[in-house]
A protein has these predicted regions:
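Short secondary-structure boundary/capping segments
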Residues: 3, 45-46, 77-80
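Residue-level marker for the onset of beta-strands and adjacent loop->beta junctions
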Residues: 9, 42-43, 86, 122
Length: 140
């Protein structure tokens, strides 16, 4: 049983270029920047997309973040082949093929091209800045 006291709040991304990264979400996916501030010596940008907040922050003094492994295809799945968060996903309420064509024209890369998922709906993965992978799934 799901605990109704919990509500999803945000995904937190550490970025080498937080302002460029935030702008990518705005230009490629139509996100909006809700807040741009500095906390603990690093920029923090709150990006809103699909009812979710993506908090993108820069390097804090003394931090040396390790790079994320790129997502890669295997026989019948894809993975970053590392422990931890692999990707996050959005349901797209529209023609996913047309959206993929638009994103491709803007230069977005697709580590996993458009295909039918296990549930029969179309899906793909796009490469976002900072080694982040985003799954886009067509609504059922």
């Amino acid at each position: 049983m799901s605990n109704p006291a919990f509500k999803f709040d945000h995904v937190h991304i550490i970025s080498e270029n937080p302002h460029e990264s935030a702008q990518w979400y705005v230009e490629m996916l139509g996100a909006t920047i809700a807040k741009d501030t500095v906390a603990r010596g690093a920029p923090q940008i709150f990006v809103e997309l699909g009812g979710m907040t993506i908090l993108i922050r820069g390097r804090r003094p003394g931090e040396e973040p390790a790079p994320t492994r790129p997502i890669r295809p295997y026989a019948d799945f894809s993975s970053h082949n590392a422990w931890g968060t692999d990707h996050f996903g959005f349901i797209y309420d529209g023609d996913l093929t047309a959206l993929c064509d638009q994103l491709s024209a803007k230069g977005v890369t697709f580590p996993v091209e458009l295909k039918k998922g296990v549930g029969g709906n179309a899906l793909c993965y796009i490469a976002a800045p900072d080694g982040v992978s985003i799954e886009l799934m067509e609504s059922r």
